[in-house]
Amino acid sequence: MKRRSKHVYFIAFILMVLGVLIQGLLLSGHIPLVHLSQFRSHATPLPFQQYQTVVASRDQNTTPVLRMQRPNFQTGMIFPQWGTNAYDSTDKNWQVGLNDIENQTSAQWIELPINLYQSSVTSTQVTVSDMTPTPNAVATGIRTAQARYYHVFIVPLLSVGGTLTWSGSIQFSTTQHMQLWFDSYWQALQPYVVAAAQAGAEELAIGTELEKLQLAPAPLWNQLIERVHQIFPGKLTYDLNWSSLYYQIPPWMHNPLLTAVGVSVYIPLTDRPQRLDPAILPGLWQEKIGKLLDSFSIQLTKQVFISEIGYRDSAFALYRPWERDAQAQAEPADPEEQAAAYDAALMNVIVDPHIIGVYFWAWSVPLFEPNWKPAAKILYKWYTSPQA
């Protein structure tokens, strides 16, 4: 009897210890899911049944959380600032705008443009101007955005001659002049590459819409890519204009150091100023734009993303969507058409496996801004969708 009593007490002690351990695991939330799986319900799944749910076991009032199908998809907004102090701690527009973008759109990525300058399309000298933020200001802006849990994408833009001359028109007749330009461009860009690296930006474009220069000898581009890569540890991209989609892909775009290629997508869906029926926009967008981007991605053998897309608050939003001149400013406002254009783009992009992100032009930019408009609600709908 005494021996049996000892066994009973020993077994009781073991059971008590095991009970304490199991209780601790349950309270800590660290019980292996492989063991929990055998207790999962086999009830009818929630809508979007391809998505799993996770249980917050630390709280007794647990709420299923829907996992995003594409958690690395870049749900972006472009938020440009101009001036030497742009993006720094004194830039209140930057501070307020970051909060508004989060609340109104739920964007996870911020595209931060840096405006460089050259005097003409044949100048070999690239410089900063009084519209260019300092490297320190850019670093501060990156940290401010990241403190609000944004990912940051740094994009250099190039203004030519202080006018609306497009950077894609820059060209040279000799390789020597091209080399001079690339060296000067690197000297202007380098301090911002350093700032982006030190502040921890996640992604950086080596250039934007330099359409005619894209035909420069591949060694010049590969040298630029290597120079940036030696400093910046994050993802590298190049952003081309949509008109380049109709040309042969330059060999340097296959450089493995470029993780993806961005496209500025201002492709019109109509050839005359008219309001389009929102019901036809998703199919029209896929036919005229989606197929073109998919074909480019397949030929490139890399995923692509929309580094810039925008639609005016206008009844003619789908006609020459890049325009911002006096005629565009005189168009009748139509926030519903703008929102329908956003919706058509996102309906196609979010589910396209060839496309890994999208950035809209632009927060607080007149004509294009979605701030406090139906377009912002469309962004929020898609950026918080389980399909994103």
Show where each model-derived region lies.
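Active-site neighborhood of glycoside hydrolase catalytic domains
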Residues: 216-239
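A solvent-exposed, charged loop/short amphipathic helix patch at secondary-structure junctions
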Residues: 122-126, 172-177, 273-280, 317-339
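N-terminal Sec-pathway targeting helices
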Residues: 1-17
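Substrate-binding cleft and catalytic face of glycoside hydrolase catalytic domains
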Residues: 72-73, 105-125, 136-214, 314-319, ...
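Aromatic-rich peripheral "rim/lid" segments of glycoside hydrolase catalytic domains that contact
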Residues: 19, 23-24, 28-36, 40, ...
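Short, acidic/polar
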Residues: 86-103, 181-195, 243-254, 339-348
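N-terminal carbohydrate-binding accessory modules
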Residues: 30-109, 143-147, 151
